[in-house]
């Protein structure tokens, strides 16, 4: 479900993957190791949810996602499949705390879209610099230009760039 993927992406925002996994595991523990539905999140104490290691901003974003899901304002899995990438980005970035990177993670990992390049992802830019032995960091705009030649498989390139140690 897009709802689950959005919440997971919010939890992982701006964190090292190990830290994200630890916080996500504690988040699930609060809900008996099952991904909670929107109603369960809205009924749970905010203090309890935040105790898994979430910042106040991430907590508020998760509560807003759950609220929009409960009010049927988020597309279903069937509806979202029919939407274009730019439509999905536009829709979800209206939620406070959900930026383009968060939606791109949903597009890549939940929807399996193959032509997404998270230009603002620092690991992608640093690892490209490392791979090409460039003396200076590259900008989001530069990786956007470079990645045009990788179409229609920019998501695949992203996976490989994330995998560089």
Predicted regions and their residues:
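Alpha-helical ds-nucleic-acid-binding substructure associated with the helix-hairpin-helix region
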Residues: 15-16, 20-94, 149-151
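Helix-loop segments that flank and shape redox-cofactor active sites
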Residues: 2-3, 29
